[in-house]
Amino acid sequence: ILDLGCAPGGWLQVAKKFGPKSSRIVGIDLLKIEKIDDVVSIEKDIFDEDIKEIIQKNFTNKVGLLMSDMSPNSSGNKKIDHLRIISLIERVLEIAKDVLKPNGFLVSKIFQGGAQGDLIEKIKIELRDIKYFKPKASRKQSPETYLIAKKN
């Protein structure tokens, strides 16, 4: 299990509690998180060139589940913020292409906002069984939703 943008660590705690006991769990974020037993946390930027190698060094096999709840710091400009989240999701997709095993799952935050058309086409090339989920806790007017899909 790999969590990109893992701070503050909530999804890692859920993965540890509900994931298979044999799962290796790794979280990566720019920010340091509190230690969680049996979870590897790496303080790193996902845009660093060596990120895929670092991920591969932490797993003996490809990853079965890649999670990402990343969101950029808000600039106050909805268009800029939307482009930033698209950039994050594109990077998550690039990483998933190399580290996610066939039939592995990707769960990623995505924001609706108009500029995601090209991104959706890229997603359809790499992934299948694409579903969208809006948590009940998310405000109705919020563009936040989640993408759940399987790697081809």
Predicted regions and their residues:
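Conserved class I S-adenosyl-L-methionine
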Residues: I1-A7
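Conserved SAM-binding loop of SAM-dependent methyltransferases across substrates and taxa
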Residues: P8-K21
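Short glycine-dipeptide loop
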Residues: K21-S22, L100-F105
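S-adenosyl-L-methionine
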Residues: I28-S75
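Short strand-turn motif at the edge of the Rossmann-like AdoMet-binding core
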Residues: L30, M70-S71, K109-Q112, P135-K136
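Glycine/threonine-rich flexible loop motifs
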Residues: S74-I85
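A short glycine-rich, Lys/Arg-flanked "PGG" loop and its adjoining helix->strand segment in the class I
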Residues: I86-P102
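Class I S-adenosyl-L-methionine
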Residues: Q112-N152
